[in-house]
Curated annotation (Swiss-Prot):
GO terms for cellular component: sulfurtransferase complex. Belongs to the DsrE/TusD family. GO terms for molecular function: sulfur carrier activity; sulfurtransferase activity. It holds the Pfam family DsrE. SUPFAM superfamilies: DsrEFH-like. Keywords: Cytoplasm, Transferase, tRNA processing. This is Sulfurtransferase TusD. HAMAP family: Thiourid_synth_D. It comes from Salmonella typhi. The active site is at C78. InterPro entries: DsrEFH-like, Sulphur_relay_DsrE/F-like, Sulphur_relay_TusD/DsrE.
């Protein structure tokens, strides 16, 4: 089956993001296709390059990035939610005349159209 996941919780502070990541790995291990992960609302914090957990903590942001590089899973974050929460890429930093970007490589700023497309092209969309 072809799946998409929507994550609405931050990398730390709630169980949503870590549960979504465990579900993503389980899907791939069972031979399913994970087309994309869409990060919405507080979920956009999963794409913050500046997140620095303690050395003895699980680095959820970097593990999402590995999901992209190792399995080709699209990691889309809602551009409107991201900008409201201070997550920007190089293009938006230039447009807004900000000194730097903080979007983790492997993540892409996207509109809600990416979520709509996933819901049309996937067999299941699971929200965390």
């Amino acid at each position: 089956m072809r799946y998409a996941i929507m994550v609405t919780g931050p990398a730390y502070g709630t169980q949503q993001a870590s549960s979504a990541l465990q579900f993503a790995h389980a899907l791939l291990n069972e031979g399913h296709e994970l087309a994309s992960v869409f990060f919405y609302r507080e979920g956009v914090y999963n794409a913050n390059l500046l997140t620095s957990p303690a050395s003895d903590e699980y680095d959820l942001v970097r593990v999402w990035q590995k999901l992209n590089t190792q399995h080709g899973v699209a990691l889309n974050i809602c551009v409107a939610a991201a900008l409201r929460r201070g997550i920007i890429d190089e293009t938006e930093a230039g447009r807004l005349e900000l000194p730097s970007a903080n979007l983790q490589p492997g993540f892409t700023l996207s509109g809600l159209g990416a979520l709509a497309e996933a819901s049309l092209t996937c067999d299941r969309v699971v929200q965390f």
